[in-house]
Amino acid sequence: MSRANSIAFQFLNMIVPPNTNLKMKPNKSDLHVVDLLRESVATGNPCLDLSYERLGNTGVLFLARMKDLSHLTQLNLSWNELTSKGIEVLAQCGSLAGLNTLILDANEIGDEGMHAIAESKTLSCLKTLSLTKNQIGDSGALALIKSANLSQLSTLDLELNQVGKERLTKFPDGTAIASLSRLNLRRNQIGDDTILDWLQTGAFAPIKHLNLGWN
């Protein structure tokens, strides 16, 4: 194993909680992740596609804390087995300040991860955010739509989530993002009550293109 990989795994062993099953000695899969991230970032391409790589939270933690990502404008982390823990790290990554497109489809991020993105000071340049199939309910969806930090967001994709599954009793304060013109809520669990609640809270106010198909 190269010295660079050795340093990388020393870092991974430091950040992984002691109660996890991650091996202390790297296997071929671990080496692939480290090499993949190093090679992908080293190209300098502003569009980084890491979809289907099964990085997990630990891989994203390594990416966010060990790599300079300031050249990125687009990042695709779909199908990577991410939870809210990985997203919390990503949302705090200072070198992602120039990111305008973030694709996180088919993970397990949930409402907690949505709140982390909504509260992020780093991701303020995001214009497109795709979150298809991520176990997101009304709380997480509305946190994004009313985020004071995501002031440039124009497209939000929440297809195949859990919006409408459980009716909220408390709604977030503030107004919907003024620049948000496209909202995809296709294939959720939205009924008349959810639509009425969202209308009353002002969530649809700036929307010009709304997809409510298959609800």
Spans of features found by a protein language model:
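Leucine-rich repeat
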Residues: 16-19, 40-47, 68-74, 94-101, ...
